[in-house]
Structures are given as C-alpha cells and as structure tokens.
C-alpha cells in the first residue's frame, strides 16, 4: 500500500473512529473501561474507508497466500468483503468468510459461512484487538472446521495484551496500526 494511502487511512481513523476522553468512560467488549475507543464501523461502513481498509489489509495478508479471510461477525465482515474485492482486482482472489458467534440453530447449523474446504489456509481478521478473545473465538471455530489459521490480521492493535494472548495459541498477530500510533 502506498504510504500516502496508509496516512489517509490513519487520518480517517483519527477523525471518524477514534474517541478520546479525559476519564475511562468507554466500556470495551472485555468489560474494561478505557479512555480510548476505536469504532472502525465508522470507516468500514463508508465506501472510501472500506476500500482503503480493504487495500491495506490485502497488502498485509497477500504475502501469506491465504485461500480465504474472515473473522467473527460483525467487525470482520466488511473487511473480508473489501479484501475479496481488492484481491480480485489484483487477479489474486481471496475468498471471504464469516464466523458466527454461535453455530446457527437451524438449517445446516453452521458457525462458519463461506466457500471453504477443510485444509485451506485462512487469515483471521479483526477490526480492533484488545484482549484477543474475539479473534481467538474465530480461530477456534476455524480450527474445528479443519482450516489452517496462518495468522490474525487486525486493523488496530490496542496494545492491551491481545498480541500476547493470541501468540500463546501459536498464532501470530499482524496489525496495520498500533493504538499508540493513532493517539
């Protein structure tokens, strides 16, 4: 990704997604209160923002040659679709997939939706990593499906233990930005 595009994405995140307070008022999914909140849906649900994230994340994952990329719904969904689009435009299609928080209660009762086959190499996506628990839930579902997880790829690493928790499971974490770079 061109440095100019990365800088443009960083500016968009700072302007639209990063919320900063004097006191810890933002409750994170981990239950912890924080002074900082990163709401990447303000970027991924915007055409330009989703394109920039798709392009940047594609550049991050493509060297690992995944067959597919996806993660826990809802944060990873637009990122997976954007990567799929950008990868197709580069004549290197990477399939998107979605991991439900729980297996579907009817029909095929799948937890993972996508055109996947056991044994395929997948990149697990995350919008923001804090403790890594959401990413690890997706990793577990992928492994149970028989997929080879090559890494967790995040837009933002909050630098609050997520990297260490993910790496304890033998999975590397790659991120476009660390929270400290955006403050």
From Swiss-Prot:
Cleavable signal peptide: none
UniProt-annotated binding residues for orotate: 130, 158
SUPFAM superfamilies according to UniProt: PRTase-like
Listed cofactors: Mg(2+)
InterPro entries found in the cross-reference section: OPRT, Or_phspho_trans_dom, PRibTrfase_dom, PRTase-like
Sample GO molecular function, one term: orotate phosphoribosyltransferase activity
EC annotation from Swiss-Prot or TrEMBL: 2.4.2.10
Root EC class: transferase
Pathway: Pyrimidine metabolism; UMP biosynthesis via de novo pathway; UMP from orotate: step 1/2
Keywords (A to Z) from UniProt: Glycosyltransferase, Magnesium, Pyrimidine biosynthesis, Transferase
Biological processes per GO annotation: 'de novo' UMP biosynthetic process; pyrimidine nucleobase biosynthetic process; UMP biosynthetic process
Family membership: Belongs to the purine/pyrimidine phosphoribosyltransferase family. PyrE subfamily.
NCBIfam families: pyrE
Protein's UniProt name: Orotate phosphoribosyltransferase
Annotated organism of origin: Aquifex aeolicus (strain VF5)
């Amino acid at each position: 990704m061109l440095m100019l595009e990365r800088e443009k994405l960083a500016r968009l995140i700072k302007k639209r997604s990063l919320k900063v307070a004097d006191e810890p008022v933002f409750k994170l999914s981990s239950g912890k209160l924080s002074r900082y909140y990163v709401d990447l849906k303000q970027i991924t649900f915007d055409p330009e923002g989703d394109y920039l994230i798709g392009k940047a994340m594609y550049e991050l994952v493509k060297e690992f040659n995944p067959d597919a990329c996806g993660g826990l719904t809802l944060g990873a969904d637009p990122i997976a679709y954007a990567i799929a689009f950008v990868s197709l435009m580069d004549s290197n299609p990477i399939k998107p997939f979605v991991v439900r928080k729980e297996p579907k209660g009817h029909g095929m009762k799948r937890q993972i939706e996508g055109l996947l086959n056991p044994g395929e190499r997948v990149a697990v996506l995350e919008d923001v990593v804090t403790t890594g628990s959401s990413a690890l839930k997706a990793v577990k579902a992928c492994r149970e499906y028989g997929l080879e997880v090559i890494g967790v790829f995040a837009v933002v690493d909050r630098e609050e233990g997520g990297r260490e928790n993910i790496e304890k499971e033998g999975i590397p974490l790659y991120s476009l930005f660390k929270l400290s770079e955006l403050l």
